[in-house]
Amino acid sequence: PTRGGRARGEPSAHLPPWAFVLFLHNHDQVGNRADGLRLTSLLAPGSPALRAAIALQLLAPHIPLLFMGEEYGSTAPFFYFTSHGPELAAAVRAGRAREFAASMHDCDPPPDPNDPDTYRRSCPWPPPGAERQAWFEYYRELLRLRAHLL
């Protein structure tokens, strides 16, 4: 990849697959969405496509990275949050308003990243239930298989 016409990074073809981290989504991708939605909220519940992607992620030779709550199918939004002083907090708010201005026609504005409630809403404990347990068991079984195969 390039930035400003200059190459970035280093060649990596000589590195083994386990030198790389593989994820389906992470805090940057989810937190930088205005709505903070995760893949589990963007796809139909129990989606075969999501289950297949998880299997590919966990059974590939790369190091799997699970995003917070992914292992139990969390559908809670994960919002961008900060704890900046007043001046920087205002600049971040203004920057995010500009960033999302063109795409916020039919949805609520993103929550204030510096509001402590935004942090609390992004870090919920999973609600109990059979669906959460089923996701957890799916991950557990794939990780057992991974340990056996790799």
Enumerate the language-model features and the residues they cover:
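Loop/helix patches that line or flank the sugar-binding groove of alpha-linked glycan CAZymes
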Residues: T2-A7, S12-L150
